[in-house]
Structure formats: C-alpha cells, structure tokens
Amino acid sequence: MHILSRVGQKLYFLISLVLVFNTGVSAQDTIKRPLEKALEAMRSGYWYEAKQLAEADGKVARDIILWHEFRSGRGSPTELREFLQRNQDWPGLPYLKEKGEQVFFESSRNEILSWFDENPPISPSAATIYADALLEAGKTNKAELIVQDKWISEVMDSDLQTVYLRKYDVALSQLHDERSIELLWRDAFEALDDLIPLLSDDYKKLVKAVVALRKYKKDGVNTLINRVPETLRNHPVLNFARFKWRLKYGYDDRAFQLLYELSEKKEYLGRPEIWGATREKLARQLLWDGDYKASYRVLSGHFVEDAKLKARLEWLAGFIALRKLKDPNSALDHFQNFIEIVESPISIGRGFYWLGRAHEDLNNLESARRAYDRASENYTTYYGQLALEKLGRSLPYDIMDPNIKLQWRNAEFIQSTVFQAAILMLAAEENGLAERFLTHLSENLSEHNLLKLESFLSELDDPHIQIRFGKRQARMGIIVFDSYFALHDMADYQWVVPVDLLLSVARRESEFDQYAKSSAGALGLMQVMPSTAQEMAKNLKIPFEEESLVTSWKYNVLLGATYLQELSYRYRGNPILIAASYNAGPSNADKWIQHLGSPLDRKTNLVDWVEMIPFRETRNYVMRVTESLTLYKTLVLGKEIDHEFSEFLGSSAYFSFTPQSE
C-alpha cells in the first residue's frame, strides 16, 4: 500500500493507534481501508453507500464523506447542523456553508428560517428561499431587505435575475439604477442586457456609453458619452471606462491626465481597488520604458485599502522614488507604509531592506543599520540574506541543526478530529486532503504544540506536507525551519546539476508534490512540460513516457535536471538567469538581458535587475529559488557558505556542467 509503505515503521504505530481508537479495527487487518473504499464510491456518485462504507472506519471517517457531500451541495439540513456542531474547527467551512445552503431548497419554512436566521444567506439563490420563508411568516420588511441587498451587490445569471424580478419587483423597483452600477464595475454585460429596459432614461444612457467603452468599440463612443446627462457625466464608472479606452487606443497623455485629476479624491475614483490593479500594470510598463516620473505619478493618490494591492503599490512607488528618481525621502514614506501593512517574513525582510537602502542614501547610517538588522532576522528570505551581507554577517550556522524534536504522541491535538481525519486520509492514500487538514490544524496551535506537530511531520517524512505546513506558518510570521526547507529523497542521489538547484526549483515548482499538474500542462516534481521532457529524453537517448513524469519522481527529476543543465550552459551557470528562464522561458530571459544587461556583467545592479523583471510571478520565482539555493547548499553540504549572497547571484556558480547532447 503506497501510503503505508512511504510512512513505514515510523508511523505504522500511529496509524494503527488512531484507527483502533476510532474503529476497533487494526490497520493490519485490511489492505484497503474502509475510508478508501468509501471515497471511491463517493467519486462514483454513490453517496449513501459511501457513508455506510466509511462508518467501518468510525465517525470521523463518515464525517469526511459528509464534508465532501455538503461541499457538493448535497445532504440534509439535519446532518448539516449536526456536522457543524461536531466539527466547528474543520477546514473550508465558509465554502461548505455556502454550498450547503442548497440542502435547504426543498426544506420546510421552519427549517429555512431556523438556519438562515442564524446564518445569513451567502448566495443570491439562497436569499430567495429565505425571503420566501420570511414572507410566509409575515416578515415582509426583513424579506425585502434580504433581496434588496443581493440585488445591488451580486451578479446573477439570467434565470436567477428573472426570478428576482418576477418575485420581488415592487421591492426592487427603485434599485435597478444602483444595480446597473455594480454590474458595470464588474463587466457583467449579459446581466445588463436584461436590466436595461428597467433603468431610468439617464442610467440607460450611462450604461450604453460605459458598455461601448468597455467593449472597446471605436465608432460612436463620443456620441454615446455626450448623451449621458451632466449629472452622470463624471460618474467614476464612466471615467474608468474612458481611461481604459484611451489606453487601449494609444491616447496615453489624455488617459494619464484623467487619472491624475481623479486621484485628488477617493470619491472621484469610486472603486480605488479596480483602478489600483491598472495603476500597477501601467506603472510597471512605464518603468520598463524608462518614463520614471510618469510611472511614479501613476501610483500617487491611489486610495487603495486592500492590503495586498496597497502593499504592492507602496513598495513599487518607493522603489521608483529611490532607484530611479533619486528621492530617498519620498521612498522612506512608501517603504514605511509597506512595512505597516505586511506580515510575512518575505515581505518584512523586503520592506526593511529597502528602508535601509533609503536611509543609506540619506547617510542615516545608524537608521540604515537598524533597518538591515530587522531585515536580517528573516534570513531565510532573499532580502534577509541581502541584509546580512550589508551587515557583514553570514547565515546563522545553527540552520544545520534540526529543530528540537518534541514528543508529539501526548499532544493535545491528537484528540482533535481534524488530526484524526488527516491520519485516516493518509491511510486512505489521500495525501492532498491530509495536507489540507494538517496545515489547517496548525493555524490555531500554540508555538509549543506547533513544534510537536512539526515533530510529527518530520516523522511522517512527506516533504510535500512539510513544505505546505512550513509555508503556512511562514505566512503567519513563524519559521519552522525543518519543514519550511524540507529535504526530498532526491538529495540522496547524484544528478547532472547540483542537488541544491534541484531542491530549490522543485520546492518552488511543485512543493515536492510528484503528482502535481499545472493548468498549463506542466507535470510532476519539477513541473516539466511534456514537450520539453520529450526533447530531454531524446537527448539522453531514453524512452519518453509522459505518464512516468507523474508516476516516477526519479524520471521526472532526471529530465528536469537535464533541462536545467542546458539552461546552466546557456546562461553560464548564473543562478538568476537559470531561475528566470526555467520559469518564463529562455526567450523572455534573453529579452531581459538585452534590455537590462546581464547579471554576469559586474556593471549590472543585480538587485535592481530582479526587481525590473516585468512578470510578477517570475520576479517572485527568482527570489524564492535563489534564497533557497544557499540554504539547501548549507543543509546538503553541512558547512557554512563562504561567499556573499550578491556575489553568488552574479556568479557562474552552476557553469561546470555541459549538456549531455554535446
């Protein structure tokens, strides 16, 4: 059995213990666990049989089937209530509750009222059954408020929108204009088609103008805009459509002028977050084109409140101010704003490093040192390692010492049904689900219990689950090193490129999940595209077997390593270029070299080079891979790294390898 063979003797006791605790049946008594059979039945659509089969593995196993059932919009109201009472700490409950609303569609009025009085409807379709029940109970005002709220805030398909109009026409009659604005912001053109006849004359004109602009029609748009009454001529949704249209057709100066004027007040923008995403893309393009003043001004007055987007805008404004406009005072403000928003070690390290750079440019050397010191605390990150270099320090030698392993068998979380469900799923060969439950379990544990859980994961020895756990903790500001930089069995073998490179790429590509499949078609541990894998197999003179890219991690790593070897040769072993080309392709890497210079050229500012990569995914990828290289090198070699990080980034560290085909 795959899972038990992987876990081996180290966890055989645990699986037997938990299964005996739940079912009274030893793990030795059967080859295939009842839950495994139940999940097979469930995926074939036999829900009742699945629940019956799961019962042989205990109540928690049956709840696993119920968890899936409710998330599929099936089940009964009674079972849903009882499940949530038992399992208030299970993962994915918001989604489960939203999908679970469907079980009330054929329920009695009392059942509907009992549920939705305590759990306000999430979906607009559920709002209709709740409103109907309220109307039957004589609670007209509350019913109208429920449907009115959904009407002005939700996009619906044509059928549901028709239901709303038929059932609640009086309650909604004064809200059609307001709904049209929501639909315009969300480009919900199909829903707007049905709504237009119900709009006031003024809003009909507004909608027609905005839709024409958002569909980038050339002919007649000025006529449509001129028909919009003066009271709506400066509506934010119309101005956003005009802004996007002008950019589309090359009227950049007019687009920028409109943006600058509207950025004076938040209310002029209407929805700053929607403008903000366009600001970031536009600022990046202007930065690439060398128009630094315009790039910076585009980011000014954004009024964005969404934390992730605001952080990106503030950091980018700070970078442009410092590195391109030579304005460290303005940069300080932006980097401070960035630091106040972010929480993860990656972002904290980044923020304080650049704060230090701004202070350094202002000759505030003590302030710079303090900022670098704060950044260096996050030494597992790209900017943390650059900050260490600024301070003249090396990576802490103790990263080679494993975390203290605590006895986990007496941990409080052993009694948690979340943990027990994870163990049952491991025994049923459902590692992906087990990982989800284990990482969710970690979110509310004390630091002491986190270390106990880490000890369990270390004994489990599934690097994919360890990495997922480590990353989840890192996002919460906690580094559990042994999991965050878990080692895969590939470290025990010799490859055509150094194993630290393979570990770093695989950690980023698949998080050590050998069964990973991307939406683009990349497969396995190294996320190799089948066409690339076929070419590498041909170079190696071995058969190409696409299925083996997933079923055999060694085959996958062999072909991925061969491709990395070719990239190493092409880019003279440079870590930045190897990572960038593996993620975005050699053609893009070549374009960036032509535009930005080569990281191998000593005149090139390496830190700026990485930050100037046009693709956010690739910028992040390069940082995550290169930060891992020195850490994995330290872990694998068992000795301190004697080079500076920036020296390594600009080096030909992986150039001592020539392609097999040569």
Regions found by a protein language model. Name each.
Residues V60, W67-E69, R81-R86, Y249-R254, ...:
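Catalytic glycan-binding domains that act on GlcNAc-containing polysaccharides
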Residues F70-G73, E101, S108, G138, ...:
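Short coil/turn linking the two alpha-helices of tandem helical-hairpin repeats
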